[in-house]
């Protein structure tokens, strides 16, 4: 179908990822997708600003090398549209919904715009049910909510991606519904590994179709900022469609910080004056527009797990600080813990969850979690004294508390299924009842006779006892 002449414009200026386009007698709406050809590729530009009466400033969703001034551009009349529905399962798409897995076109149940309003208050629903992950430190101290938003905070190289992959392994594989994974500005190698791992483990079938349970939407590190700033929305659109069909969807994002970072790269090119630490002035608005759409309605639920990179390990940086407000549970990864060789390197005193209430998790779970935190807090407060005067100067009571805290620290570690190839020890999924029983027994001193090493990298407390016997036999 030929487009009306006035819907065609011409490129007047190209500045990196930002392209200015002039139209005659027609101005595309903000957020509209406009298209042009770049070599043999379809290049989508998204309208970001109106400059004067006839020119729009757009953000390119792909590289702009090869574009020339005067080149013709067409207004599509709608925002970027991505395929949704069962055909997306088992497939990898990019930000504009094109397949990138070389398995042919994506069969879809229609197209949906990536920009949408958040559900109304009256449509939203909240559930107070726990999502059991099989990871001891998470289930005990900062349990996740079904249909909630979960953030994994951590600096570079402390294990966010490994933790998110373990959650996919433990939750998505056992989960009856569908999952969507949005790879935002992370390593292409990890995205590729995840795709093949899903096929090997039976979560997805090669080429998608019947039997596949996870859709993948990637805009990785090598993509221009426009793609990285929008790919989270493309993934969310696929997840929203499943939710509106009555499904319980798992939505994984790795990494939400790259969404902010891409926004800040584009913001400067659009001529906006930067705010604190050089971020875009619209940081809170951009984050809110994304996060408010990730919600559970009366039709279905979206449980989202988001990895959030913390620049220079500073949790007060505007990017992680803005995301804190939107989350139901935060899992904070700490470099000091990873340096001790304790993985997952989750900070038991810094991680929080609104689910840790006796009304939701029950009295026993709540009391055990608080006992564990109390012992660890006491150890933390004694560390200065230990560093200066040594353990001998502590009272008997404090010595016992420190010994228990060190055992708890090690018992919070756990071998992961996805890390088997690196560690050589098989992964462990620990039931919530076993987790509570084990930590309660350590706090009550039932295992004071076991050495610290017995608690390191085991699943249940029974395994720790076995390991203790083995260590004693080796020592003898």
From Swiss-Prot:
GO terms for molecular function: ATP binding; ATP hydrolysis activity; proton-transporting ATP synthase activity, rotational mechanism. SUPFAM superfamilies: C-terminal domain of alpha and beta subunits of F1 ATP synthase, N-terminal domain of alpha and beta subunits of F1 ATP synthase, P-loop containing nucleoside triphosphate hydrolases. ATP binds at residues 154-161. It catalyses: ATP + H2O + 4 H(+)(in) = ADP + phosphate + 5 H(+)(out). Its EC number is 7.1.2.2. Pfam families: ATP-synt_ab (PF00006), ATP-synt_ab_N (PF02874), ATP-synt_VA_C (PF22919). GO terms for cellular component: plasma membrane; proton-transporting ATP synthase complex. PROSITE patterns: ATPASE_ALPHA_BETA. It is found in: Cell inner membrane. It is a peripheral membrane protein. Keywords: ATP synthesis, ATP-binding, Cell inner membrane, Cell membrane, CF(1), Hydrogen ion transport, Ion transport, Membrane, Nucleotide-binding, Translocase, Transport. It is an enzyme of class 7 (translocase). Produces ATP from ADP in the presence of a proton gradient across the membrane. The catalytic sites are hosted primarily by the beta subunits. HAMAP family: ATP_synth_beta_bact. Belongs to the ATPase alpha/beta chains family. F-type ATPases have 2 components, CF(1) - the catalytic core - and CF(0) - the membrane proton channel. CF(1) has five subunits: alpha(3), beta(3), gamma(1), delta(1), epsilon(1). CF(0) has four main subunits: a(1), b(1), b'(1) and c(9-12). This is ATP synthase subunit beta.
């Amino acid at each position: 179908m030929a487009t009306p002449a006035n819907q065609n414009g011409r490129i007047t200026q190209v500045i990196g990822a930002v392209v200015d386009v002039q139209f005659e007698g027609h101005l595309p709406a903000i957020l509209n997708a406009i298209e042009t050809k770049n070599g043999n590729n379809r290049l989508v530009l998204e309208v970001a600003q109106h400059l004067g009466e006839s020119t729009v400033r757009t953000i390119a969703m792909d590289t702009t090398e090869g574009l020339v001034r005067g080149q013709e551009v067409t207004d599509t009349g709608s925002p970027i549209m991505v395929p949704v529905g069962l055909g997306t399962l088992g497939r990898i798409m990019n930000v504009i919904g094109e397949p990138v897995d070389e398995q042919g076109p994506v069969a879809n149940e229609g197209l949906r715009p990536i920009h949408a309003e958040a559900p109304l208050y009256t449509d939203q629903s909240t559930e107070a049910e726990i999502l059991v992950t099989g990871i001891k430190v998470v289930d005990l101290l900062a349990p996740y909510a079904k249909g909630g938003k979960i953030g994994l905070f951590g600096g570079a190289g402390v294990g966010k991606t490994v933790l998110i992959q373990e959650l996919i392994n433990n939750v998505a594989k056992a989960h009856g519904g569908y999952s969507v994974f949005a790879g935002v500005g992370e390593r292409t190698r990890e995205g590729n590994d995840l795709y093949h791992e899903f096929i090997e483990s039976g979560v997805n079938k090669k080429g998608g179709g019947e039997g596949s349970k996870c859709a993948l939407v990637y805009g990785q590190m090598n993509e221009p900022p426009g793609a990285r700033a929008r790919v989270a929305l493309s993934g969310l659109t696929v997840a929203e469609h499943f939710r509106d069909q009555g499904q319980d969807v798992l939505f994984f994002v790795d990494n939400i910080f790259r969404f902010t970072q891409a926004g800040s790269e584009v913001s400067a090119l659009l001529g906006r004056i930067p705010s604190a630490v050089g971020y875009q002035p619209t940081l809170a608005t951009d984050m809110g527009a994304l996060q408010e759409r990730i919600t559970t309605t009366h039709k279905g639920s979206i449980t989202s797990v988001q990895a959030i990179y913390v620049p220079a390990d500073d949790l007060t940086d505007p990017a992680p600080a803005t995301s804190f407000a939107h989350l139901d549970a935060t899992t904070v990864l700490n470099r000091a813990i990873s340096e001790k060789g304790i993985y997952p390197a989750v900070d038991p005193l810094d991680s929080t969850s609104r689910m840790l209430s006796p009304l939701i998790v029950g009295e026993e779970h709540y009391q055990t979690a608080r006992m564990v935190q109390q012992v660890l807090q006491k150890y933390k407060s004694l560390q200065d004294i230990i560093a200066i005067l040594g353990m001998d100067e502590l009272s008997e009571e404090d010595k016992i508390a420190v010994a228990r805290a060190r055992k708890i620290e090690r018992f919070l570690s756990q071998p992961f299924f996805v890390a088997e190839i690196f560690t050589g020890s098989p992964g462990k999924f620990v039931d919530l009842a076993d987790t509570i029983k084990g930590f309660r027994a350590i706090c009550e001193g039932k295992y004071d006779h076991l050495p610290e090493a017995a608690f390191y990298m085991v699943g249940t407390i029974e395994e720790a006892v076995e390991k203790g016997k083995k260590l004693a036999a080796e020592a003898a």
